[in-house]
Every structure is written in C-alpha cells, then in structure tokens.
Amino acid sequence: MQEIEYSFSPEIAEADRPVVLESRIYREWLEASQKKFVVTKVHFSSVDFLRKGRQPLFIKLTATATLPDGRPVHGIVLVRGNAVGILVVLRCEGQKYLLLVRQPRFAIGEQASLEIPAGILDWTGDYRKVALSELKEEAQIDAEESELIDLMDFWYQGKSDGFAASCGLLDERIRLYAIERDVTPEQLRAMDGKDQQYTEEIEWIRTEVLPYEEAARQFVDGKNLIALFLYERWQQSRK
C-alpha cells in the first residue's frame, strides 16, 4: 500500500490531528478510496467536531490521487460518513399519507425544510439500529426492526450500502428504508405538529403529516425523492 504524506492547516490543533486520522469516518473513506485509487498525499483543510464527544463530524480534505494507470483525479472531498433515511407511509381510511419532519436548513436557505426522518450512521455501523433511533427521535415513532423495508437491499441486491448523496464532493452514502402503518384518524392527527428540540445538536424539528401526492410535489430534498421512487418500485414488484 502506498505510504501517504499528511499535512494539516494551522487551524487544526496539534492535539486534534491524531483524532482526525483515527476517526471512523476518515478511516472508512480512506479504505474505500485505496481500493480503487492510488493516494499519495492528504491535506486536511478543516474539521468540524461533534458538540459532544470531540469526534469529527465533517472533514474537509484535498488528496493527491490517481487512477491505477496514473491518470490524476480531482481530490477535494468533504468526509462525513454514511447516513440513513426512513420513508414513513401511513394508511388511513383508504388514503395514504407521509409522516415527515420540518427543520431549518441554513445551507439551502430554508427555515423549514420538508424531509423524511434521517440521521448519520454512528460508531456501531448498524444502519437498522440508527434508523429505529431516528424514527423515535425525530418522528416520535416506536418501531420494530421487522417493520423496516430495506429499499437499498431491494434495489441494489446487496451490492451497495446506499446511494451517493453528492458524488462530486461528499463521501456520504444514504441507506433508505420505509415503514408502513395503518392508523386511525385520531392517531393520524396526533402524529402531526409534534415539536422536538435538541439544543446540544442544534436541532429544531416539527413533524408534519401530508397526503402522499401533496407531499411528493413539495419535495426538494434528494433523499426524499429517491426514497419515494424506490418505495413505489418496491410496491410494483409485489403485485
């Protein structure tokens, strides 16, 4: 394996540098990259840490890398690791609804971005466990693992952990699931408009229940649309 020459921008503290190099998200990115590319240098431009635990959340780096035949490739990467997303489909009196969340998304200038419940993969690497945790945390739903419909396994037949969110910059792959629930009108109303505040993570979340088609036409978040597409293909495959 090619030895890598490392460098760090001055703003990354000396004490944090070993933490970055040993972080799960960096090691997993590097391992995957070295299977297909020759990496000779990595310069770390900046690192954002989790507010609790001092683990890297985002790692901005520039690598010097080539294809095996020596052709150079663009090496700017924002490393953040993988994530999960869950499409929650509710059936009530013959109609379908989606249980979604709204939250501020500063990067796209949205105070209340409409999204499926989602979250980053934690140190366990257990996608299903994280999916169930996010359903509870964001959507206030207690679900069993047996309820999860693995849309990635259905579509990729075990060949990929998820779809690439922004393959020109991010290493992130998002694994998508769906769950289906039959609910009463009272339960449907109770799921709408629930507020969650997680000040340590700077998250302000409100649930929103919308008719299936109405919700779909409001989506601008890519993972929402892909989850919807895969769910509908999964449904078609069962007919």
State each model region's role:
Residues 1-115, 120-133, 141-239:
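N-terminal leader/linker segments that precede catalytic domains of diphosphate-processing enzymes
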